Amino acid sequence: MRVSSPQGKFADGAARVDRQVLVRSEAWGKHLLHHYESGLVVHVHLGLYGSFTESAIPMGEPVGQVRMRLAGADFGTDLRGPTACEVLTAPEVGALVDRLGPDPLRRGADPDRAWRRIHRSRRPIGSLLMDQQVIAGVGNVYRAEVLYRHGIAPQRPGTALALDEWEALWADLVQLMRVGVRRGKMHVVRPEHDHGEPSYAPDRPRTYVYRRAGAPCRICGTPVAHSVLEGRNLFWCPACQPK
């Protein structure tokens, strides 16, 4: 694999893994790990604005601020705008993973680890679901939609969540996120509630509440509410998710 940093910010890191065999890639929550034959690992976190774009070999001149370029035999990819792009050793990867909560997409993930933190916390469940040290990988869309699907107000404290409610939330997150990976897009509206109404934006999945502030709830017609919780937009139905 040829690894470079056209932008220059990752030049030293790229040189450490350039011309090595990329053995495997894996994700832990929102953290992408590229494992190279030397044992070094490139850690990428896209954040809100990062993205990969793929193209066939030979790749053209870099466009924009390309943090990392990977070029294989037939295809390559450019990384732009990540929150993190760094080379880690095996112990550093272990420390990173140890800081994360269970990932619904990983087989063997233990939801009890998350439950032990949730049921002792007075923070809102809407905050806890987005805390990567509690659960790894849940973003704003899944947070809003899974709480709606189970009639749970995002403002409810973790201490007020029952174990059976948490078990149902976890099982639903596992199913929804795996479907999203398999299909390449999110599917969160149950078939019986999906009557083909437009999404909140072109080429985006239809949702119950996410990005639908002021629009009627798909089930009860109550206007979807919006607020900001810990710096992130929050959406819910006041009738279907009573406080």
Please name every model-derived segment.
Residues 49, 73-75, 80, 86, ...:
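Generic hydrophobic/packing signal
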Residues 83-123:
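A short, charged helix-loop
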Residues 1-100, 238-243:
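Acidic, proline/glycine-enriched N-terminal capping motif
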Residues 60-64, 73, 108, 119, ...:
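Short, amphipathic alpha-helical segments
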Residues 2-18, 26, 31, 115-243:
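Basic, nucleic-acid-binding surfaces and adjacent catalytic neighborhoods in DNA/RNA-processing proteins
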Residues 56-59, 96-107, 156-163:
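Short histidine-centered catalytic/ligand-binding loop motif
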